[in-house]
From Swiss-Prot:
Biased composition (Low complexity): 375-419
Binding-site residues for Mg(2+) 3, renumbered to this chain: D481, D485
Residue numbers binding Mg(2+) 4: D481, D485
Region feature (Disordered): 352-426
Its job: Bifunctional terpene synthase; part of the gene cluster that mediates the biosynthesis of betaestacins. The bifunctional terpene synthase btcA converts isopentenyl diphosphate (IPP) and dimethylallyl diphosphate (DMAPP) into the sesterterpene betaestacin I. The C-terminal prenyltransferase (PT) domain of btcA catalyzes formation of GFPP, whereas the N-terminal terpene cyclase (TC) domain catalyzes the cyclization of GFPP into betaestacin I. The cytochrome P450 monooxygenase btcB is then responsible for the six-step oxidation of betaestacin I to yield betaestacin II.
A GO term, aspect molecular function: lyase activity
Organism of origin: Neocamarosporium betae (Beet black rot fungus)
Span of the annotated motif DDXXD 1: 100-104
UniProt-recorded name of the protein: Sesterterpene synthase btcA
Highest taxon listed in the record's lineage: Eukaryota
Chain spans, region Prenyltransferase: 334-722
Pfam families, sorted: polyprenyl_synt, Terpene_syn_C_2
Pathway involvement of the protein, from the record: Secondary metabolite biosynthesis; terpenoid biosynthesis
Amino acid sequence: MANPPVTEWKQSEAIPAHVAQETGCFTTLPIRIHKNNSIADQATLESINDWKQHLDDGWESRSGSAISKVGNWCSFIFSEALPERLPCITYLANIGNIHDDATEDATLDEAITSHAQFSTALSLDTDDEPSLQEAKTRRFRHLVSNCVLEILSIDRDMGTRMIVSYQKKWLDVMEHLNYEGIESLEEYLEFRMLNGGMEPFWLMCQFGMGLNIPDAELAPTRHIFEPAEWALVLTNDYWSWGREYNASLTKGSRIVNSIELLSRLRNISYDEAKEVVRDLITTYEAEYERRVQDFLRENPSTQMYLRQFIEVAGLVVAGNHYWCANCPRHHAWKEQDQAVHAVDQLEEFPAVEAQSPSSATHTAAPQEDPPVTEAPSPISSPSSSSSAKPSSSSAADSSSCTSTSQHSPSETDSTPPSSLHLLKSPHPVDAPCTYMSSLPSKGVRSTLIHALNQWFQISSRNVTLIKEITSMLHNSSLILDDIQDQSPLRRGKPAAHTIFSTAQSINSSTYLFVRAMQMVSENFESSVQMSFLEILQRMHIGQSYDLHWRFHLQCPTEDEYFEMVDAKTGCMFEMLLLLMSSKSRHVKDHSFTSFIRTFGRYFQVRDDYMNLTSGEYTAGKGWCEDLDEGKLSYPLIECQKMAPASFTQIMGIFRAKQADTAQLSDETKKYVIELFRKSGVLDSTLDWIMEMERQLLMEVKRLEGVMGDSNPMLYVLLQTLSLNQ
């Protein structure tokens, strides 16, 4: 650069340019490697061993490892990561590499399914795709759960942002664009920005550096990152070309590479196209440098952390280039038909400890690619046709109000003959339920089912069935709750009864109970049916006490409150436990009673607390909606014990509210919240929640001992719900 960066790099050390050039590397940018390369190597080996343990499909040894004789890939691309954060992002990056390699030889449909399974395993707060093969998804989930848990424990806000982007902006889109339809280099680069997951990659860099820069603050710098990303894409294409071309000849693998594209579009040889790509790489590197200089000159007061992140992009480009020029991942095919196993690589290249670049061996010269002077007709796998589409046939393809044919094959035969058109679906009774199912969900029940299935190991069909039954009951209860609470909002959208009428919504809600019971009777033994009905009975009794206390302004004791919670909230979790254990050959539910009861109580009190304090809840349900309802929640019970005078005032507000259907004014709500805060009620409630979180962690440890198997996904669920900032 004309004006070299003044950033002080703390975690990395320089690789001399002449050392890099001796290996064939031609980047024009400065190269740095993390001082703790051994940390990255260890995390890489753990990811390889874990892949073998949980998936055991051979790709842990067939995939080219991040380890190389010049250093670990992640030591170059995360060269300024904090040492304590380097292991988890290295682990996640290498798992992504193995997964990417494993899908290269798959058909397009198979690749999309595999990406969806991996994406589902990373899901933190949404219901996943029920048509996926449960066993494969479960193995993916067990593979990544410990890594996800570590990420969230280090930095939950940035970790969540990073993981969601990794899931939504890479795995969910990487195979959904048609490479064969691309007609220009610009389209190709845009395609690879999604296919290569650039957004989640930069978030991983931020996480590693301990940053969490808002998108709005980064937006003015977006143009700087573009040429860096283009150089990254073309660098990978340049050095992976020989491997990809060889795989297309020997295995019929798909080629997705700018060299093939330029050869095809410009009618030039592969060798000529490769030279074009080489020139473009250095051109884009120079453009990146120019844009950095211009931005810093025009914005001299740029915050140091933002400047550092901008300049790290150049280190990423250069470090990735140096690694690509030397890594077994791109070059081992020249000596054998698969990459060297990472353990063997470590033995051959023992430079796993941090060392001075001058003392390391950086002299290996690259071998030439296969001589190809003219481009033959493009080689493509039959699976890469643009007409290929993922198949999706499952119980979740239609509304849970109506998707029952797979559970009742004789339903049509058993229906009494009738000429009435009204008996044919869809019915008006389905509409409120379909609407509720379309609203965003936190997905706690779904995540809990999948986490427990690590132990229960029931089939994919039964997982889908149980999710559908519990979803019906949950949606039914939400429809009724909104009516009983006179709530105008549900998950940030209009409540069902405000759209379909109160009468129709009540009818739809009760119909869902009937449908759920019908599905249970068709798929479970009579003893399970009886237990299911008993749980439904307790759920309604629990709800009746909640309504009774509210109407009569009768504040329960803490013991009475939790008895109500065990019935109203806990029974839903108890129900999924009943259904899962009845389909499992490995587990019965008696060992889980304490965990489920504690989880139900924790979930309800957490909900009570968040309703009064969370901006997220305000967006979904309205501000302090429990106060509008006059709900006798846990904080109010605490207030009765801790501040009787404040309790009397709040009950007076609720009593006056009963004669007025309007919502409480913002001023009144602020006053009530201030009473809670000054009396220590909110702090006391949060302390109780923290104690329940500790108890739940102890319960999971106990269950792991009983089951003889760890369950990191349960820890991830508890971490995502945790209020321990």
